[in-house]
Amino acid sequence: MLKTVRCILVAVVLVAVSGCGAGKSVKKLVGLGGDDLTVYKGQVYPATSKIAIAFQPAQVGKSCRVFAESLVLLPANQTGKDIENSLLAEAGQRGADQVLIGQTRQGEDDAGLQFLYYGPTYEYLCVDQCGGWKFGYKLWEAQGEWVTLGYNEWGKTGVRFETPLVMQVVMLRCQ
């Protein structure tokens, strides 16, 4: 009986606390919250400074292995150069030799710059599987219109995206 009362009391306290802005912490504490996708949990490599960019899987080297699958949330009013700088900084920190950029959509919310990491559980050769873009599907489907972001926009200071964006990205090691 005493254990039941304690459990009910703990549940009441947790419900009360969750309404005070601590909902995510409480959910995680009791096992209801998911993983924090902004925390990179993959293979750790030495940082790199020279990173090749590809917009098509056919442009990726045959020896390149995918070690990070990410949806990148970009804030509004970014230039092509801002996007390039943000992406290359993160990819370099993670040790990428090459980055394959998938499609881009207008973001429904402006959450600032965030890299949401979905895996993979094990590295895989890009030539075998790249281009499927199956990770983060629920979030991806909830986004807005398609946005063109390719070689003509990449790295350009004169190209500005007024809305937040969500971009598909995989990071690769090619050594």
Predicted regions and their residues:
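Sec-dependent bacterial lipoprotein signal peptides
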Residues: 1-20
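Bacterial Sec signal peptide processing site at the extreme N-terminus
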Residues: 14-39
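Compositionally biased P/S/T/G-rich terminal and signal peptide-adjacent segments
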Residues: 31-71
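C-terminal partner/receptor-binding element of secreted or periplasmic proteins
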Residues: 45-49, 148-175
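Soluble periplasmic/extracytoplasmic beta-strand elements of cell-envelope proteins
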Residues: 52-54, 66-73, 98-102, 168-170
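Short, well-ordered alpha-helical segments
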Residues: 70-112
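Mixed-charge, low-complexity intrinsically disordered segments
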Residues: 107-161
